Amino acid sequence: MINRKFIKHFESFSERSIPEILKKISIELKDDISKYSIIGYSNTFEFEYLSFNIDIKLSNNGSYYSNIDLLKIIKEPDISVDIVVYIPNNFDIDYVVATIIHEVRHIYDIYTINSENDMKSFVDDFYIRKLKIGNYTNFINLIYLSLEHELIARNNMIFPYIGSKNMNEKDSMDLVKSTFIYKSLDLLDSFDHISFVNSIEPNTLLKLTNIFIKDVSKDNKQCINIDDLILFYQKYEEYFKSLVSEWKLEINKEISKIYELKTYSNNESIIGGTHRLFIEIYNNIIYT
């Protein structure tokens, strides 16, 4: 049993880059998982105040996906959290670890949240689930992708995915663009408010929209006609596009940080090797 009472808030939820503890976890996870047959892998990990059980299973649709029970974590904060990960047969171990880190970031955030504003992203997640109805699900899925904790968790997948690969920065960027980390932003960018409004019967859309406004937008102004609906979803189309621009920059920043670190590490290695060579030459001169 882990005592959560005295957890130190190392970083705020607003910190978008991967925290140092998650970098360490990703490296240790890869080392451990590499020792075993990955499909069917199961193990429990404890890192400081984070405790989780990992189960890796074969996906039935040839893709990577994972899940955790966020509500259970909130209700029972002292439990070890179950992370179930589904992977394809032709998996990339780095992306497997990245998928796990996505969920670990959620756990980390729940245990280190220190403001109501930080909580809103998770609260909205709970509210939107009941609005997955018919074609309205298309909008709700985009809202889910746009939640702050989801954007951060996807961004935190970049370090474990490309950090240990022997690639240059451009090729790493191209690789990230081929994943859901980047494609999720393309989905947000593709939202067309007119097409969406026309895809749902007006009275049904009014009802669902006003529930969304009350529970998620927390706005007193309800939609009363089709013009209101068009304006409301036009604003969301603009909002999604602004998020896309913002988070594509975040992806670039995250990749650049990784390569700055690699350059620094390489320079340290070169300097260390040169120093050792000078010592060896000096010893040979003095003692021979």
Which sequence ranges carry the predicted segments?
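Short acidic, low-complexity intrinsically disordered linear motifs used
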Residues: 2-16
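Amphipathic, interaction-prone secondary-structure segments
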Residues: 38-65
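Active-site scaffold of zinc-dependent metalloenzymes
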Residues: 57-95, 104-111
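Post-HEXXH active-site segment of zinc metalloproteases
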Residues: 94, 110-142
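A conserved beta-strand element that flanks and buttresses the S-adenosyl-L-methionine
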Residues: 100
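Active-site catalytic microenvironments for nucleophilic, acid-base chemistry
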Residues: 107-115, 159-164
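Active-site metal-coordination segments of metallo-dependent hydrolases
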Residues: 139-154
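Pan-zinc metallopeptidase signature
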Residues: 155-288
